[in-house]
UniProtKB/Swiss-Prot annotation:
Region spans: Disordered: 1-28, 69-88, 100-134, 147-193
Organism encoding this protein: Danio rerio
Transcription regulation is among the record's keywords: yes
Tissues with expression: Predominantly expressed in the embryonic and adult central nervous system.
One biological process term in Gene Ontology: cell differentiation
Biased composition annotated in UniProt, kind: Polar residues: 1-16, 105-134
Biased composition, class Basic and acidic residues, residue ranges: 79-88, 155-170
Gene name tied to this protein: pou3f1
UniProt-recorded name of the protein: POU domain, class 3, transcription factor 1
């Protein structure tokens, strides 16, 4: 009773019209929609039967129902189908493929007529083609029969391709100035032959100027703030550093050589250079006459005392340190000249053997 009471007015008077379900209009329109769809499908099959040849040669246009029927004039049905198609198109784009109905798409050339993939289109309700009525075009995305698998629409594919291409161009463009910079640095970098020649010349000029490798390292620290060890300078002269480090150290050493050569003339500059590092004493050259006097004294006394060295230095007008070093070097030379294991004769024995004639031993005959 509660159910039937909803359809009975309160004044208990029956309406003149028969009772109808509230959704009867939509049910009627839905029925009409199904009937029209069946009719369209039937006409499509008749078109296939009348046209001979492959279905690819069909030139029918899309079915655009424009008659003022319940199906075409129903705005709420068109709106529902529009929403349904929009949701479906969004789902198709998200899933990466398109569900399709094979609907013939008219083309400009008859020989290219095919079941081409087309996106869903909706005509505006007030467009001239629809005569003020909303018309639905059931031409959703489909696949071609004789073409390869369709990819994304060019509107979706080309931006990705263009972005990838532009990204590749952006990745390639920074490399061009970098490569030019590398070429420029390679042109400025000296070759291995140049480094070898410079290292040889540097060593010769350093020895000629009287500087040790440690002196050069300390001088570089005083001039440029970078102190280099004696090992680094030695490895540079021996070409044992890496090519990169050789290229970095070459201009510093070259500049040091130029400043040293320019400051060699005046004594004040020599003192300044000596203050930069421990300056090696120059090699003392002894005259021939002085050297002969030292040799005679060495033959008499190979190891003189400190007093004898001082007296000899005053006599020969030499420094005491020079005389002492000369005797040390002379003794080392004598040791190298004497074989190992043979007793070293004294100088007196040598002179006595040279002055006295050799001894002759007489043979005595046996007593008979």
């Amino acid at each position: 009773m509660a159910t039937t009471a909803q359809y009975i007015p309160r004044n208990n008077s029956l309406p003149s019209n028969p009772l109808m379900h509230p959704d009867s209009d939509r049910m009627h329109q839905g029925t009409t929609y199904r009937e029209v769809q069946k009719m369209m499908h039937h006409e499509y099959l008749q078109g296939l039967a009348t046209n001979t040849g492959h279905p690819m040669s069909l030139t029918h246009h899309q079915w655009l129902p424009t008659s003022n029927t319940d199906w075409t004039s129903g705005t709420h049905i068109g709106q529902a189908e529009h929403n349904k198609a929009s949701v479906q198109s969004r789902e198709d784009l998200g899933n990466g493929y398109h569900r399709s109905h094979l609907v013939h798409q008219p083309t400009q050339n008859s020989h290219h007529g095919s079941w081409a993939p087309t996106t869903t289109h909706h005509l505006s309700p007030l467009s001239p083609a629809s005569n003020g009525h909303q018309s639905l075009v059931y031409s959703q995305t489909g696949y071609t029969m004789l073409s390869p698998q369709p990819s994304l629409h060019h509107g979706l594919r080309d931006p990705l391709h263009d972005d990838a291409g532009s990204h590749d161009n952006q990745m390639e463009s920074p490399q061009q100035p970098f490569s030019h910079h590398q070429d420029h640095s390679d042109e400025d970098a000296p070759s291995s032959d140049d480094l070898e020649q410079f290292a040889k010349q540097f060593k010769q000029r350093r020895i000629k100027l009287g500087f040790t490798q440690a002196d050069v390292g300390l001088a570089l620290g005083t001039l440029y703030g970078n102190v280099f060890s004696q090992t680094t300078i030695c490895r540079f002269e021996a070409l044992q550093l890496s090519f990169k480090n050789m290229c970095k150290l070459k201009p510093l050493l070259n500049k040091w050589l130029e400043e040293t050569d320019s400051n060699t003339g005046s004594p004040t500059n020599l003192d300044k250079i000596a203050a930069q590092g421990r300056k090696r004493k120059k090699r003392t050259s002894i005259e021939v006459g002085v050297k002969g006097a030292l040799e005679n004294h060495f033959l008499k006394c190979p190891k003189p005392s400190a007093h004898e060295i001082t007296t000899l230095a005053g006599t020969l007008q030499l420094e005491k340190e020079v005389v002492r070093v000369w005797f040390c070097n002379r003794r080392q030379k004598e040791k190298r000249m004497t074989p190992v294991g043979v007793p070293h004769p004294t100088m007196e024995d040598v002179y006595s053997q040279a002055e006295t004639p050799p001894l002759h031993h007489t043979l005595q005959s046996p007593v008979q």
